[in-house]
């Protein structure tokens, strides 16, 4: 019996309903802005490197911004979306995620995935 099967047997004795990721979420890649595009005031953004260096599991405010002009070409996460770093310089940080809980859409950089879903983000 696998570790997952043991946990399910222990915590969910009546079993669990299995769903594919596609049944509860859609996944898209982030945009294409870089650190050089950061500015002091503008559109909130999350750079993939910040996911594992600056953020915890949840965020409702960003650390950085990009200009309106740069933002026009980007992809955005909406409230409750999961933003996942899909690359890193070390294995521990690959696939680290944050749940975006802010009240406005946030631009997401490349090397990130936006997971839009209908689940509780916490």
Give short role names for the model-derived ranges.
Residues 1-3, 106-107:
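Short acidic (Asp/Glu) and glycine-rich catalytic loops that position anionic groups and cofactors
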Residues 3, 7-30:
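Non-catalytic DNA-recognition/assembly elements of restriction-modification systems
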Residues 3-5, 32-33, 53-56, 91-92, ...:
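Short loop/beta submotifs within extracellular cysteine-rich repeat domains
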Residues 22-34, 49-81:
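Sequence-specific dsDNA recognition surfaces
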Residues 34-41:
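Short coil/turn segments at secondary-structure boundaries
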Residues 47, 61, 68-122:
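A short beta-sheet element
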């Amino acid at each position: 019996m696998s570790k997952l099967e043991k946990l399910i047997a222990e915590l969910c004795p009546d079993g669990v309903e299995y769903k594919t990721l596609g049944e509860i979420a859609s996944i898209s890649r982030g945009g294409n802005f870089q650190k050089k595009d950061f500015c002091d005031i503008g559109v909130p953004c999350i750079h993939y490197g910040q996911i594992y260096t600056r953020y915890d599991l949840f965020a409702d405010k960003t650390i950085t911004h990009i200009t309106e002009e740069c933002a026009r070409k980007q992809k955005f996460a909406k409230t409750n979306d999961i933003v996942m770093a899909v690359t890193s310089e070390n294995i521990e940080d690959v696939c680290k995620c944050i749940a975006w809980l802010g009240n406005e859409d946030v631009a997401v950089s490349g090397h990130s995935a936006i997971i839009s879903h209908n689940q509780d983000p916490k």
